[in-house]
Amino acid sequence: MTDIQLNGKSTLDTPSATMSAKEKEAKLKSADENNKPPNYKRISDDDLYRHSSQYRMWSYTKDQLQEKRVDTNARAIAYIEENLLKFREAHNLTEEEIKVLEAKAIPLTMEEELDLVNFYAKKVQVIAQHLNLPTEVVATAISFFRRFFLENSVMQIDPKSIVHTTIFLACKSENYFISVDSFAQKAKSTRDSVLKFEFKLLESLKFSLLNHHPYKPLHGFFLDIQNVLYGKVDLNYMGQIYDRCKKRITAALLTDVVYFYTPPQITLATLLIEDEALVTRYLETKFPSREGSQESVPGNEKEEPQNDASTTEKNKEKSTESEEYSIDSAKLLTIIRECKSIIEDCKPPSTEEAKKIAAKNYYCQNPSTLIQKLKRKLNGEDTSSTVEKKQKT
């Protein structure tokens, strides 16, 4: 059998026939590199996030967030004090009754409001998980609830009345279809109570329902760590870290890091909590310092010398990639360590603390209850459990 002749040459002698698959791939990559514009920069997840409505509307500095909460609290205090004044003017109160009102019908502080919001945000998570809703729906419900109480005060809208509404709206937002009647039945609520504050919730969210959660970056980092540290990480161990980080991310959504950091940064912070040495090594390998020095991170893995052509090509790719991102690993580590400390330092209030705050909140909104309680006390009736029955947390 003879080879097909092309211009006097065998097809076996042509470059396309003798070129290996790896060489072809390298040639295509080289062509792509040459075709890139001079100011080419790869778009990262952080870049995409910073063009989202979530970033524009719900990202704050620490001072901005504090100021927003103080303003919301101040408006509610003015509203409560006006109602208390109207109540006193409308009723002929005794001196003792006035003293009781002044002592117990006191508006909540900003810190007390935040504690109550955090307590009920945890309840949103527990209820949503009890309903076997997907992780993304649970995360969105938590986000909706906490954002709602940046715009509104617990002294004006009872947190309990908005819990099921946020979960149901999260189902719709994340395309998890369930009818309102089915949802109300599963949540042991009613159709009217689920829908009562839905428009108010939408209005408070500024009709911005798309959420960027840290779960997607977690999957990306899970794959990229295995690629960057190829042969140096145990897959079973990485699987365990992945599962634990998903839980940590859900816990992180109950903190203020969602207002200060991007989803990939939050993901890296949760990974840092699980294994700081692994994350440090990954970042320093992927984004080497600009001076070319690279600190070693202690580990149990043995590194084997690799001097073949494929290793050289991989190193070139990593170098090009890190130039495109222009990320300083030391600076990034500083940022995610700050995020990590906020996640770890956040402690939700206990049930007992939440009950005290809820009772105080109930009294300032319902001063007549205090007067009735005082009268029953003067008549020798038991009043110890009256508010607890009305204000179950």
Curated annotation (Swiss-Prot):
SMART domains linked to this entry: CYCLIN
Gene Ontology cellular component annotations, sorted alphabetically: mitochondrion; nucleus; transcription factor TFIIH holo complex; transcription factor TFIIK complex
GO biological process: cellular response to nitrogen starvation; nucleotide-excision repair; positive regulation of Atg1/ULK1 kinase complex assembly; positive regulation of autophagy; regulation of transcription by RNA polymerase II; transcription by RNA polymerase II; transcription initiation at RNA polymerase II promoter
Description of how the protein assembles with itself and partners: CCL1 and KIN28 form the TFIIK complex, a component of TFIIH holo complex. Component of a complex consisting of KIN28, CCL1 and TFB3.
Cysteines engaged in disulfide bonds, as pairs: none
Bias (Basic and acidic residues): 21-35, 300-321
Bias (Polar residues) ranges: 1-19
Similarity annotation: Belongs to the cyclin family. Cyclin C subfamily.
Keyword Ribonucleoprotein: no
Residue numbers spanned by region Disordered: 1-45, 289-325
Gene Ontology molecular function: any one: cyclin-dependent protein serine/threonine kinase regulator activity
Function, in words: Regulatory component of the TFIIK complex (KIN28-CCL1 dimer) which is the protein kinase component of transcription factor IIH (TFIIH) and phosphorylates the C-terminal domain of RNA polymerase II during transition from transcription to elongation after preinitiation complex (PIC) formation, thereby positively regulating transcription. TFIIH (or factor B) is essential for both basal and activated transcription, and is involved in nucleotide excision repair (NER) of damaged DNA. TFIIH has DNA-dependent ATPase activity and is essential for polymerase II transcription in vitro.
Note: Present with 8700 molecules/cell in log phase SD medium.
Protein known as: Cyclin CCL1
Alphabetically ordered keywords of this record: Cyclin, Transcription, Transcription regulation
The encoding gene: CCL1
Domain of life: Eukaryota
